[in-house]
């Protein structure tokens, strides 16, 4: 099962993420958990989230980039749900062997991520990748949709189809 952890603080203003979800939902075995819809008060039901994760084979963190990072509710979700003894540490093997895909949208182009001595978008994924590896997850190459503020409908649609194709390819590779 593919579990999409969707963290968009303003989902009604989204064009790119909305299309990505629409395409992903056409696949069998996809569950979407919209964190800002489920937890507007930031009071996360840890047991429910861990139960959803336990059913997943592929976990997707889908969100818009905010100040070169993840939205605050997704950060809190990781802090609370990936708990010691469950996701890591002694007895913390619940996520071992599962896959993680970071699916992120950005308003700027790739050149916006040429930062200092460590240029490139990949540098921004390192904390997420380290978290995944520490918890025994298999980190997949990220899916990034850039320039979403200026993309025309045809480009957004094409990128959303590409996202669906990435998910489908994962399903075919791991569940034939």
Curated annotation (Swiss-Prot):
One matching Pfam family: Flavodoxin_2
Segment forming the signal sequence: none
EC number(s) on file: 1.6.5.2
Subcellular location: Cell inner membrane
InterPro entries: Flavodoxin_fold, Flavoprotein-like_sf, K_H_efflux_KefF, KefG/KefF
Source organism superkingdom: Bacteria
Stretches assigned to coiled coil: none
UniProt GO molecular function: electron transfer activity; FMN binding; NADH:ubiquinone reductase (non-electrogenic) activity; NADPH dehydrogenase (quinone) activity
Residues binding FMN, per UniProt: 8, 14-17, 65-68, 105-108
Cofactor(s) this protein cannot do without: FMN
Key words of the record: Cell inner membrane, Cell membrane, Flavoprotein, FMN, Membrane, NAD, Oxidoreductase
Any one GO BP annotation for this protein: potassium ion transport
Membrane topology: Peripheral membrane protein
Reaction catalyzed: a quinone + NADH + H(+) = a quinol + NAD(+); a quinone + NADPH + H(+) = a quinol + NADP(+)
Gene Ontology cellular component annotations, sorted alphabetically: plasma membrane
Function comment: Regulatory subunit of a potassium efflux system that confers protection against electrophiles. Required for full activity of KefC. Shows redox enzymatic activity, but this enzymatic activity is not required for activation of KefC.
Summary of subunit composition and partner proteins: Homodimer. Interacts with KefC.
Annotated family: Belongs to the NAD(P)H dehydrogenase (quinone) family. KefF subfamily.
Protein name, per record: Glutathione-regulated potassium-efflux system ancillary protein KefF
Gene responsible for this protein: kefF
């Amino acid at each position: 099962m593919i579990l999409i952890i969707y963290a968009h603080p303003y989902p009604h203003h989204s064009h790119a993420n909305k299309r990505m979800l629409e395409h992903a939902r056409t696949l069998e075995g996809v569950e979407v958990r919209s964190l800002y819809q489920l937890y507007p008060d930031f009071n996360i039901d840890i047991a429910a989230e861990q139960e959803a994760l336990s059913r997943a084979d592929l976990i997707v963190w889908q969100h818009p980039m905010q100040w070169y990072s993840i939205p605050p509710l997704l950060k809190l979700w990781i802090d609370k749900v990936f708990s010691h003894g469950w996701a890591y540490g002694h007895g913390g093997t619940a996520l071992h062997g599962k896959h993680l895909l970071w699916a992120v949208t950005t308003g700027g182009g790739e050149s916006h991520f040429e930062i200092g001595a460590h240029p490139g978008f990949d540098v921004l994924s390192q904390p997420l990748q380290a978290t995944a590896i520490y918890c025994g997850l298999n980190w997949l190459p990220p899916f990034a949709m850039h320039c979403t503020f200026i993309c025309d409908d045809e480009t957004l649609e094409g990128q959303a189809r590409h996202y669906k194709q990435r998910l489908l390819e994962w399903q075919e590779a791991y569940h034939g």
